Amino acid sequence: SMDRAPAAITTPTEFDRVYCVGDSRTVYTQVALGASAPSNVEFIAKVGEGLDWFKSSGYKTLYRSVAKRPRIEKKAVIINLGVNDLKNSASYVKYMKKVAANLKKYNCKMYYLSVNPVNSAMIKSVNGKARTEAQVAAFNKAIYRGLCSGRKRSFTYINTCTNLQMKGWI
């Protein structure tokens, strides 16, 4: 069955450096990879956070790390934020456009990873922070429309949400 970790973790080769920026989903991806995380992948993430954290801390860390690498290096930045502040999509679009413009000067290709599906019934049953399927869909749509579509798009969209909904988890 497919409910096992892959036999090998592949090191990204299209880019010299990959930055994974996000919340708990990114933190626990790093934890799951442990020592097998590729050496050219850097994680900048904090559990339970969103745009405020990124503006006050996460972006500074990302920018410093990107800026100290040679400009000739090809870099990928994957943003995986939003699940903790789903009602803030307009602010994300506005701020992330500036982030993309700044980082593209350092040879960064920008990616936005969709917020993955939630199970609102399960969240409610464990008294978790209320999030609904409709909120996730609205956030993802706003990010896609505002950042990832059209001629002047700032990001390439990675639609894991629909992929998981269509194909399942495991």
Question: What are these model-predicted stretches?
Answer:
Residues 1-17:
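N-terminal low-complexity, Pro/Thr/Ser-rich intrinsically disordered segments
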Residues 12-95:
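Conserved SGNH/GDSL esterase-like catalytic core that processes O-acyl groups on lipids
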Residues 18, 77, 110-112, 157:
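Hydrophobic/aromatic residues located in beta-strands of well-ordered beta-sheets
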Residues 28-29, 86-93, 119-126, 165-170:
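Extracytoplasmic/secreted cell-surface and envelope-processing proteins
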Residues 34, 71, 82, 97, ...:
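Sec-exported extracytoplasmic/periplasmic mature domains
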Residues 83-84, 102-136, 164:
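Active-site segments of SGNH/GDSL-like serine hydrolases
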Residues 91-99, 133-139:
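Charged helix-capping and loop-helix junction motifs
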Residues 120-160:
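Substrate-gating cap/lid alpha-helix
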